[in-house]
Amino acid sequence: MNKLYIGNLSDHAGPADLESVFKDAKIPVAGPFLVKTGYAFVDCPDEGWALKAIEALSGKMELHGKPMEVEHSVPKRQRIRKLQIRNIPPHLQWEVLDSLLVQYGVVESCEQVNTDSETAVVNVTYSSKDQARQALDKLNGFQLENFTLKVAYIPDETAAQQNPSPQLRGRRGPGQRGSSRQASPGSVSKQKPCDLPLRLLVPTQFVGAIIGKEGATIRNITKQTQSKIDVHRKENTGAAEKSITILSTPEGTSAACKSILEIMHKEAQDIKFTEEIPLKILAHNNFVGRLIGKEGRNLKKIEQDTDTKITISPLQELTLYNPERTITVKGSVETCAKAEEEIMKKIRESYENDIASMNLQAHLIPGLNLNALGLFPPTSGMPPPTSGPPSTLTPPYPQFEQSETETVHLFIPALSVGAIIGKQGQHIKQLSRFAGASIKIAPAEAPDAKVRMVIITGPPEAQFKAQGRIYGKIKEENFVSPKEEVKLEAHIRVPSFAAGRVIGKGGKTVNELQSLSSAEVVVPRDQTPDENDQVVVKITGHFYACQVAQRKIQEILTQVKQHQQQKALQSGPPQSRRK
């Protein structure tokens, strides 16, 4: 994305004028200006300079009395689903941005772009062309906390490949016909084994040695290891460390990583750099808990097997746009390389499990797009849930469009209440808007109560979003051990006459439900129904477990209601005959 479109130009504007403007702004170009009537094109050295030109010149610089418009040059065939949103308030809460974006469609990914500006920039991918167009129309020029958002298309090469022209469609071989529609759920990770890149942090002073003269060294590594390697040297100007992204097979990735380590150690000897040079791997926070393992067992085993010392940056260092943790490995080049293989093996396993889980949950909890809820890392290339014939893949659970508002009582640690509410109630208000649910925290039952009840009222999708964010907040704020999963207790009320259906004959239904969801489900015996003739069902478990259990119980209740309605209809005709 280093090609720029320069619009709103005067008819008198020429290449020399544009060269002068870019020179004054200290923005280099990689070729001549191609000037047409009223607009022009130019190439920048890289994406970073292109973005800097957009931020410095678009709407801010006049040429012959007309303000220039500068944006990425995107061919019409690639103006599909991807947008770049600039000038985002720097301290904006994720919930606010998320709730704004989802108003216009399903957001498949939202990634921050590193810039030198104070405001934030994100690249957003919507699930359809129409949704992206609507978001562009509505958000470009939108005022958000006294900042004016600027939105433009960026190239969507993936969509262009997935939607070939009619001429190309007819040339596919017989084996390719319909392959994208007929892919089995288990084939996703096998088709794309390289979707998860290795991300490294290296000291800035070694970047030159890694790249080599005119890029010779990095080209050589790329060729030998069959890898794609991006050194993000233009990002975070002045930072002590730069990130490197390596995309290849697991073997190619590890080989490239080892080569980079060897180059850094050799360069350190040449410049008499005395400090230890550890291997630093960036990993999305979603994977870190499973890498550590229960009581740190997985990490300890990797340390013992590879003779290295491994530490992981604390949760407190995570920010809105940086969900990555830094895994620091200390040892020799050989031992660090072995540790990288083991660490990435574990992370890839977690990634593949998340894909499988996402496909499973998408069918267990129909109507939800899990990509849109920010549950998986946007940089991981997470594919959408596989589709197929409803009769073979989708269980006959009630669709959300037909569901009524539900009330769930979620019990959270009393100490976490302040974090859930936020300063002056800001967090809980934003969460309520984002989820589309009513969220209230009930008074403590006693002064020394260890848990507090959160009352969440809304349709199933709102419940999913609200409960998911509450689970996440409790984890982020360290109200449970970093090595543990968050497990909360949720209460839902069911009509007393339906409690037996939830339990099943001899407890069969509730046992199957616990096996399916991995949640603990209890219908306390000898309950006295409340004034609405309802009793409580208690569900305890991690987030997904609780969600699956809640949905299954709601399905049972729907079946009970439908059965009652059918009985009422069947009893109607005899009554009319007696009249």
Swiss-Prot record:
It is found in: Nucleus; Cytoplasm; Cytoplasm, P-body; Cytoplasm, Stress granule. Residues 158-192 are annotated as: Disordered. Residues 195-260, 276-343, 405-470, 487-553 form the KH domain. Expressed in oocytes, spermatogonia and spermatocytes (at protein level). This is Insulin-like growth factor 2 mRNA-binding protein 3. Its main location: nucleus. The keyword Hydrolase does not apply. Residues 2-75, 81-156 form the RRM domain. There is a cross-link at K450, K475 (Glycyl lysine isopeptide (Lys-Gly) (interchain with G-Cter in SUMO2)). InterPro entries: KH_dom (IPR004087), KH_dom_type_1 (IPR004088), KH_dom_type_1_sf (IPR036612), Nucleotide-bd_a/b_plait_sf (IPR012677), RBD_domain_sf (IPR035979), RRM_dom (IPR000504). Pfam families: KH_1, RRM_1. The modification Phosphoserine is found at S165, S184. The keyword GTP-binding does not apply. Keywords: Cytoplasm, Isopeptide bond, mRNA transport, Nucleus, Phosphoprotein, Repeat, RNA-binding, Translation regulation, Transport, Ubl conjugation. One of its GO terms (molecular function) is mRNA 3'-UTR binding. All KH domains contribute binding to target mRNA. Domains KH3 and KH4 are the major RNA-binding modules, although KH1 and KH2 also contribute. The KH domains are also required for RNA-dependent homo- and heterooligomerization. The integrity of KH domains seems not to be required for localization to stress granules. RNA-binding factor that may recruit target transcripts to cytoplasmic protein-RNA complexes (mRNPs). This transcript 'caging' into mRNPs allows mRNA transport and transient storage. It also modulates the rate and location at which target transcripts encounter the translational apparatus and shields them from endonuclease attacks or microRNA-mediated degradation. Preferentially binds to N6-methyladenosine (m6A)-containing mRNAs and increases their stability. Binds to the 3'-UTR of CD44 mRNA and stabilizes it, hence promotes cell adhesion and invadopodia formation. GO terms for biological process: CRD-mediated mRNA stabilization; mRNA transport; regulation of translation. It comes from the Eukaryota. GO terms for cellular component: cytoplasmic stress granule; cytosol; nucleus; P-body. The modification Phosphothreonine is found at T528. Can form homooligomers and heterooligomers with IGF2BP1 and IGF2BP3 in an RNA-dependent manner. Interacts with IGF2BP1. Interacts with ELAVL1, DHX9, HNRNPU, MATR3 and PABPC1. Belongs to the RRM IMP/VICKZ family.
